[in-house]
Amino acid sequence: LSTAHRLCDGIESRGSSKSGKSEVRVWKLSNGLEDTLYKASHVNHPSNIWVRSHKENYVWLCKLWIYLCEQYGLRYKKTHMTYIKLGDALCGNTPMNIDTGINLSKFPQCMPEECKREDAITAYRSFYRAHKREFATWKNGIPEWFN
């Protein structure tokens, strides 16, 4: 979401990497969010391209992010720091220069071809069963779809 703001509304320039050893692309904002939002990252990842392609995609992801932050609160009995820092900035403001004329578009499926399906939820479930089983854990029991 921060990357969407930076790429839609920012001015691209060159800056130094964190170590100072290399030059990196940066996007500076002049709308008061420069010091609040995270730096742009993974700008060509299909999910990043998807979220900044249309306002409806951005709004959908904001709603998902808020839901995930709420789930974090239920599980760990505290508010995630990212929500404290970015909640109002991200979900109270869509990027100014984002396309507004198209409805929610098809979700990108960033996974091996053998897991891709017509439906993104089915595809990601297949991906997690096949490739992410070793690290998947749950606090409220294993979901039925995972077996």
Feature map (PLM): residue ranges:
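Sequence termini and other peripheral, non-core segments
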Residues: 1-44, 48-147
